[in-house]
């Protein structure tokens, strides 16, 4: 019943564009901290007082903050101002977590209302990170160039607030958000060291960042649709915002004056745009000259329309046939796959050389060894070393940890076209496990393996074979070529920490 109350009240507040009153509802914080909605009090520990706090403290804090003038408060006043210090960090986390839940649910309700009248593909399989690679196999083999874009960060806090201003019209909520950003983050940049960001809720941070980046995508989508006369529904939800429609009137005039002579150069029905982890990829069948135009278009768009400083070096042009693209833990490139076809017509026969383009996905072995080196599994040259911090665990726990890491890496990199690099990673983890156990028992690696045997480490290499033997028993019994092929899984929703080492 209370779950319905949450959505009903959100709907009523959304109709009047008032989100600020929801900050004072305890069930908002129950949703934020995954507590049951039947609990009347949200309990959080604070080591300064030793007792518990309810959301009533948050209500009082918001009232007192609203009466403060944050322009005359500086971070150096933390000893004099009662709002600063450890208690204030707790309050900031609670308020930002509640605000994150409010804007997320409000945005999701808007997304649902938008998608009801449109045919939007819904598939849980598309949530997998690996689902993008079959798409790349079908599309990238016909494309020539890729723009590897490093999306710039906003240099001022007000830019992040403006991203919400045009669809959240509640001035009180925006004032609270602006106050929190200025109080608990660096005054010059939102992207400060981890110590400063840790007091701010990461969900709200990601929402603000994605809302800001969606403004880039809206303008890019508008220009792309105007130039190629193709309609896209994947990002259509962002086209309904008042902010975007307000920009269209201004952009039409700008395009007529500034892009009238060269807008036709952008006509390309083979443009594919992918955004991930603060980066973006723009793949096209255009020539290098046209890709350069897209490159400087992005830079000018960031600087002159969004007031974000950027340089041309943040956008790199990559020719897929010559260079590899570092994308989601894989080095992707397009290579020619030569084939010879013999044809016979009547008494004459001739040979046809045919070369087909194929997407090649390889493991970035150098960066992956660097990640293993930082995690103390090997040195910088890739030689396995023991893991002394795990020596206090039992033998079964140590083996289970190594096997789990090995399986996760094998699972994620199952789409590699060359398995040799994957075997090397397995070898590093396997020998590191043996050295860790040998060091724990104060023995040598040779003596330890001789005493226990090597059967207990077969899990490192047998898991994939067991999976394939269950999936394809007949094929697997006659040939193991399938095991050497590329397999994309549909259950990978996050990148392994060792893979995502940037």
From Swiss-Prot:
Primary localization: plastid
In terms of Pfam families, this protein maps to: Intron_maturas2 (PF01348), MatK_N (PF01824)
Identify the keywords attached in UniProt to this record, alphabetized: Chloroplast, mRNA processing, Plastid, RNA-binding, tRNA processing
Q: Does the keyword tRNA processing apply?
A: yes
Tell me which GO cellular component terms the UniProt record holds.
Answer: chloroplast
| One GO BP annotation of this record | RNA splicing
Which GO MF term does the entry hold, naming one?
RNA binding
Sorted alphabetically, which InterPro entries does this protein's record hold? Domain_X, Maturase_MatK, Maturase_MatK_N
Subcellular location, in the record's words? Plastid, Chloroplast
Question: HAMAP family in the record, alphabetically?
Answer: MatK
Functional summary from the UniProt entry: Usually encoded in the trnK tRNA gene intron. Probably assists in splicing its own and other chloroplast group II introns.
Q: Which family does it belong to?
A: Belongs to the intron maturase 2 family. MatK subfamily.
Q: What is this protein called?
A: Maturase K
Organism name: Theobroma cacao (Cacao)
Recorded name of the encoding gene: matK
